[in-house]
Amino acid sequence: MRLLVSNDDGVYAPGIKALAEALKTIAHVDVVAPDRNCSAASNSLTLTNPLRINRLDNGYIAVNGTPSDCVHIAIREICTEEPELVVSGINAGANMGDDTLYSGTVAAAMEGRFQGLPAIAVSLSARTPVHYDAAAQIALRIVEGLKAHPLPADQILNVNVPDLPLEEIKGIKVTRLGARHRAEGVVRTTDPAGREIFWLGPPGEELDASEGTDFGAVAEGYVSITPLTVDLTAHSQLNALANWIEKI
């Protein structure tokens, strides 16, 4: 089995090392990741600057681009054989609810799907996570399960793991995305030269963390697995929209 591993925290992050080392026990693993932290890069691609790669001593490849760049260039140019699965992570921090739209971790998995490959994104739910090895073992089990149960062509799996020792994780729940309140306001301040600068405020508090959501599962000590679709169409609204838009 051949796997491509990437992330958005960067090629030097502890999460990608833990993930790659665990997966190497069952597969050939290529690691291609950003040369710096690219959190919240979403699905952005680099179109106005050239991409360069740097082959590190440990065999990993660093790219001066976004997570989506890394997966795209890895599949198209770097991997000597096409991988069978893309695994993104392990992210330092959860990617649940609305966060998935901003997440570079989820975006790397989505890029794998755009390139025709099944993919999963793995995140460790804590501000300063500790138990990367536990999350890596969960990822390993999911990858092994996917051998017998391949993903549909239009889906990825978004996996969020509570930051607990493996033996304290209660189990796995299949969930839907929860939701957050609006993000907190922008912070306006000045730099040392007196020039005005802005910092984006932190994400809003959880709005929907009810039973069945990713937020709810992780809060209870369970791994959350949410199947995400690439199709963003609001299918339930098509007829209602057509009824009035045709009269314009």
From Swiss-Prot:
Its cofactor is a divalent metal cation. A divalent metal cation binds at residues 8-9, 39, 91. The keyword Nucleotide-binding applies. Keywords: Cytoplasm, Hydrolase, Metal-binding, Nucleotide-binding. It is an enzyme of class 3 (hydrolase). It comes from the Bacteria. GO terms for molecular function: 3'-nucleotidase activity; 5'-nucleotidase activity; exopolyphosphatase activity; metal ion binding; nucleotide binding. PANTHER family: 5'-NUCLEOTIDASE SURE, 5'_3'-NUCLEOTIDASE SURE. Nucleotidase that shows phosphatase activity on nucleoside 5'-monophosphates. This is 5'-nucleotidase SurE. It comes from Shewanella amazonensis (strain ATCC BAA-1098 / SB2B).
